[in-house]
C-alpha cells in the first residue's frame, strides 16, 4: 500500500573492527534488513578503538557506541577472578573469558536503550566465545534473539571472509600472509591461528606485541613490591594506584622483563583442543604475588579447599557461566577467605621469570618461633608422639587385620 513506511528492526552488534565483525554489518543488512547498531566495549584495546567509529559507519552501521568499561572490567571481573586464584588448566589466566560476559552485559543494556529485538556477535561456531556471549545474554535478557552469523552463512574460512570484505570495500587488519586471530584487553593479548595451529611450531619473537622476548630482556633483574588489601592489589612500589593504572603499570614492568608468555593447547568447551599463545604480563605478576600472600595468611584447610574452588571457578568462567548461581555462591566463599589476605609481596622479574623475593602481612600465621631449627622456640617435640599415634591409628588397625587374616 502506498505511503506505508516500515521501520527496520534493530540489532545490536558486538563490534571490534576486526575481520569477523567488519563483514557482519553488511551481512546483517543484506540478509535480514536490520538496522545495525554497533557496540564497542573498551576493556583496554588501546589504539585499536581509534578508527572504529568511522569504520563502523562506513561498513553500514547506523550508529556506534564506544563504551569505556575499563574500570568496571578490572574491578568487577578481573579482581574477583584473581581473588579466586582461578587458572584454567593450570596455565590460562582467562583474559578473553571474563571479558565476554561484560560485553554481553553491554549488548543487553544498549538493546534495551535502543529498543532492539536482537543482538549479534562475530564468534565462530568452533570457539568458546559464542557460548560465553549467548549465555550472558540468556542470563540477563532471555527475550532477546541472538544471531551468530558464523553458524549461518556460507563463509567457511578467514580467506573467504577477507574476500567478502574486499568485495565490499571494507578494510580489515588481517592479511593472508599473517592470518592470526588476536584479542586484546587490559589483561592480555591472545594469538591464535596461522602457523600456531601446528603445536610443533614455536612462536617467533615477531609474534609478541607487548612482551619483550625473554632473551632480549635486561641482564639485571627488576624488583617490584605490591600491596594487597583483602586480596585486592592497591599499590605498586608503595604508590597507591587506581585499578586500571595499577594493571597498566604492572603490564609495563613485566613486559619489559619478558614476563607473562603462556603457550597452551587447551581443551575448548565445544569439544576440541586449540592452541593459543597469550601475553599476560601484569596478570602473571599479580597471580604470583596474590598466591604468595595466601601462603602466609591462609590456614591449611582453607587453602586446600580453596584450590578446589579455584579450579571450578576457572571452569565456570571459561565456560561462560559468569552470571550463574554457582559462581555467585563461590564468590561469597572466596570473599570470606580474603579477609586476612592483606600485606606486601616483593617479586624479582628477570628474563621471563617472576620469582617471590619476600612477603609480609599483619595477619601472617607463619610463626618463626614454632618452626625454628635453632635452640628454644615454643614447640615441644614430645607432643608429636601422641599426634602420630592417633593420626596413624587407621593404618595400624588395617595392618593388624591383614596380618590376622593372612592378607599380607
UniProtKB/Swiss-Prot annotation:
CDD domains on file: ASS (cd01999)
PROSITE patterns in UniProt: ARGININOSUCCIN_SYN_1, ARGININOSUCCIN_SYN_2
The subcellular location is: Cytoplasm
Question: Cross-referenced SUPFAM superfamilies, in alphabetical order?
Answer: Adenine nucleotide alpha hydrolases-like, Argininosuccinate synthetase, C-terminal domain
Protein name, as recorded: Argininosuccinate synthase
- Positions bound to L-citrulline: 92, 97, 128, 132, 181, 190, 266, 278
The pathway that the record names for this protein is:
Amino-acid biosynthesis; L-arginine biosynthesis; L-arginine from L-ornithine and carbamoyl phosphate: step 2/3
A GO term for molecular function: ATP binding
The entry describes its oligomerization and partners as: Homotetramer.
Amino acid at each position: 500500500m502506498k505511503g506505508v513506511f516500515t521501520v527496520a528492526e534493530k540489532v545490536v552488534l558486538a563490534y571490534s573492527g576486526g575481520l569477523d565483525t567488519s563483514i557482519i554489518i553488511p551481512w546483517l543488512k543484506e540478509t535480514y534488513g536490520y538496522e545495525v547498531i554497533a557496540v564497542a566495549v573498551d576493556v583496554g584495546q588501546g589504539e585499536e578503538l581509534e578508527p572504529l567509529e568511522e569504520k563502523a559507519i562506513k561498513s553500514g552501521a547506523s550508529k556506534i557506541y564506544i563504551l569505556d568499561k575499563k574500570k568496571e572490567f578490572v574491578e568487577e571481573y578481573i579482581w574477583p577472578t584473581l581473588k579466586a586464584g582461578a587458572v584454567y588448566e593450570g596455565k590460562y589466566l582467562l583474559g578473553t573469558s571474563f571479558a565476554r560476559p561484560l560485553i554481553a552485559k553491554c549488548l543487553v543494556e544498549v538493546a534495551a536503550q535502543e529498543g532492539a529485538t536482537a543482538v549479534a556477535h562475530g564468534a565462530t561456531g568452533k570457539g568458546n566465545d559464542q557460548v560465553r556471549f549467548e549465555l550472558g545474554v540468556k542470563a540477563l535478557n532471555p527475550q532477546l534473539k541472538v544471531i551468530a552469523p558464523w553458524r549461518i552463512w556460507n563463509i567457511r574460512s578467514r580467506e573467504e571472509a577477507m574476500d567478502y570484505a574486499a568485495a565490499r570495500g571494507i578494510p580489515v587488519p588481517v592479511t593472508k600472509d599473517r592470518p592470526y586471530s588476536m584479542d586484546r584487553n587490559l589483561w592480555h593479548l591472545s594469538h591464535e591461528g596461522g602457523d600456531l595451529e601446528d603445536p610443533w611450531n614455536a612462536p617467533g619473537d615477531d609474534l609478541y606485541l607487548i612482551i619483550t622476548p625473554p632473551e632480549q630482556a635486561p641482564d639485571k633483574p627488576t624488583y617490584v613490591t605490591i600491596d594487597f588489601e583483602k586480596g585486592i592489589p592497591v599499590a605498586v612500589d608503595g604508590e597507591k594506584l587506581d585499578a586500571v593504572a595499577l594493571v597498566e603499570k604492572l603490564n609495563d614492568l613485566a613486559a619489559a622483563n619478558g614476563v607473562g608468555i603462556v603457550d597452551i593447547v587447551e581443551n575448548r568447551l565445544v569439544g576440541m583442543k586449540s592452541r593459543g599463545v597469550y601475553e599476560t604480563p601484569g596478570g602473571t605478576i599479580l597471580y604470583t604475588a596474590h598466591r604468595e600472600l595466601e601462603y602466609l595468611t591462609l590456614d591449611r584447610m582453607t587453602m586446600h579447599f580453596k584450590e578446589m574452588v579455584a579450579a571450578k571457578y576457572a571452569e565456570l568462567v571459561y565456560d561462560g557461566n559468569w552470571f550463574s548461581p554457582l559462581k555467585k555462591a563461590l564468590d561469597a566463599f572466596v570473599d570470606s577467605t580474603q579477609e586476612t589476605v592483606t600485606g606486601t609481596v616483593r617479586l624479582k622479574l628477570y628474563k621471563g621469570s617472576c620469582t617471590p623475593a619476600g612477603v609480609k602481612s599483619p595477619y601472617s600465621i607463619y610463626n618463626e618461633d614454632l618452626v625454628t631449627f635453632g635452640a628454644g622456640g615454643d614447640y615441644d617435640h614430645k607432643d608429636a608422639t601422641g599426634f602420630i599415634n592417633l593420626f596413624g591409628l587407621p593404618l595400624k588397625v588395617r595392618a593388624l587385620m591383614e596380618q590376622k587374616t593372612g592378607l599380607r
